[in-house]
Amino acid sequence: MSNEDISKSLKNIETSVHDDFIKFAQKLVQTKSLTCQEREVAFLVEEKMKDLGYDEVTVDSVGNVLGRIGNGAKILMFDSHMDTVTVNNLNEWEHDPFGAAIENGRIYGRGACDMKCALAASVYGGYIAKEIGIPDDVTVLVSASCMEEDYDGEAVRLMLKERNLRPDAVIICEPTSLKIATGHRGRTSIEINVKGTPCHASNPNNGVNPVYLMTDIIRNIMKLSDDLDYQDGQDNGSVALTNIYCNTASNNSVPNDATIVLDRRLANGESEESISLEMNRLLEGTEGSWKFMDIPGKSWTETDFMFHSFLPAWNISSDHSLVKGAISAFKEIKEQDPVLYQMGASTNAVVTAGLLHIPTIIFGPGNMEQAHATDEYCDIQMMVDAALMYADICHNFS
């Protein structure tokens, strides 16, 4: 079958299910699914995959939905997360955040861009791939994962561990405007604590104020931030102080201790060991102690987990076969060259590529500027194009 025939077949298959595809995307947006509260969306995805004839559909102990097509040794996985951030400014929205209104060729609503339209595209992309055919030696997995917004990559890590899976390649379907992201920075959350000696605030000299002791550390953080900014190259790390709080008996007491939280974005090559050395230098000569944050959580299935917040940076060569496959699919559908770039945001790729070193790209519909935005939306044609491109990648995967 020629490339032209393949493209025509892909589009004909999509046309036959187009209305159902759009309605499914709308239904996903209409269904609330905050982090660790994705139950109803998980049921929708599971039911849709079964209706579309996936070879196997399962839900793991954490609540991730995984659909399988084919049974070959080579595994290509698509991943989209089901959860969204909340809506805390309802009066500023022109569209109902959970109405999934269609206007000007766009679906509006919370999660439309980040990333329920991408999820719909991956589910229907899998169906189209099954209809047109995939190589006998290939398995396509379509993952609808949980709790990405608060626990980047943890659900995917647990899913792969529980199922003893190691895909040969992964496509994270986060919004890239169908540009191909070949890497992004990692991140870690670091907690710094300083102990004090509490006393009544009317006699502050009877105690030791930990907030005052923290000021030298904060100055060191500001200097570290400047030093990272001044490094040569575009792939720099960064550091930001994002929270500060005290453990105090009352507002008329000197606190017992003070804590700050750092968001440390990681460049390629930065490891737990190198960041540990950096933090030790930062606190040298001060009263502070530090640790990488381990954050407990409970999934929608009531499964407890502990999220270790060190997520490495990653990249992939533009010469890799996965990247070339995405480039070819884009050209097939859009008849033009795609854009390759380094993404600014963090995604589940911190686990697939950063921790597990599985070849990964980020490639999905929607403009990242719309993620978490008021009147969030995704372009319908871009969503359809994504499904066609995903199917094309599956058809040609080797």
Question: Where do the model's predicted regions map?
Answer:
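A generic beta-sheet turn/junction motif
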Residues: 69-71, 80, 185, 196, ...
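Hydrophobic/aromatic beta-strand patches that form the interior of the parallel beta-sheet core
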Residues: 76-78, 143, 171, 190, ...
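Active-site metal-coordination/substrate-binding segment of hydrolases
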Residues: 75-141, 380
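A structural signal for short hydrophobic beta-strand segments in well-ordered beta-sheet cores
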Residues: 57, 67, 100-102, 241-244
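N-terminal helical capping/dimerization or prosegment-like subdomains
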Residues: 2-88, 257-261, 275, 380-384
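Metal-dependent amide/peptide-bond hydrolase catalytic core
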Residues: 2-4, 16, 191-398
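Acidic/histidine-rich catalytic neighborhood of metal-dependent amide-processing enzymes
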Residues: 115-185, 189, 398
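Acidic-glycine-rich active-site phosphate/pyrophosphate-binding loop
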Residues: 87-103, 167, 182-193, 328-329
